[in-house]
Amino acid sequence: MVSLQKLEIELQELFKQKQYSKIIFEITSQTEDEERSSSLCNLLGLSRISNDNKNKDSLSMALRDFKQGYLKEKNTNHAIDCLANFITSSVLLIDLEKNYKFDFSEIINFYALTEKFCINHRSINLAMAMVYRRLN
């Protein structure tokens, strides 16, 4: 088993260098789903959508990563970042698929569970604005 903290630091440097494919390889080859921290899940999801042109498959895989990261820690800063990216990526996928009858209840429930931790978190509030705009 690899030291997750050391891996996170190394991968953050790779992310700054925009080496997304390498990040995806390192995370998926050195860790199992259940041992990844919210931070690693977030980094993996961001790398998946930054590596491609936001196609359906990369967005779907990133959504799984973001959701997993949020559910692991719920009220940490990394989990809130995962939730913001989960919401934004969901909206991007909905727009890509032109799925205008999408059920936003899961997103709204996740947000409601963490709302008091998200009050000053700009990215999640912008993401929720995207959701509410699509509901009207």
Regions found by a protein language model. Give the residues of each.
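Alpha-helical repeat scaffolds
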Residues: 22-30, 56-71, 98-117
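Short coil turns that delineate tetratricopeptide repeat
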Residues: 35, 74-77, 119
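Short helix-adjacent coil turns
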Residues: 17-22, 74, 102, 136
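"A position-specific structural signal for the A-helix of alpha-solenoid helical repeats
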Residues: 2-5, 9, 43-47, 85-88, ...
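Start-of-helix register in tetratricopeptide repeats
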Residues: 5, 39, 78-81, 123
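Heptad-repeat amphipathic alpha-helical coiled-coil interaction surface used
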Residues: 24, 44, 51, 70, ...
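Alpha-helical segment of the N-proximal tetratricopeptide repeat
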Residues: 4-29, 33, 49
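Short coil/turn linking the two alpha-helices of tandem helical-hairpin repeats
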Residues: 45, 50-56, 90-101, 134-136
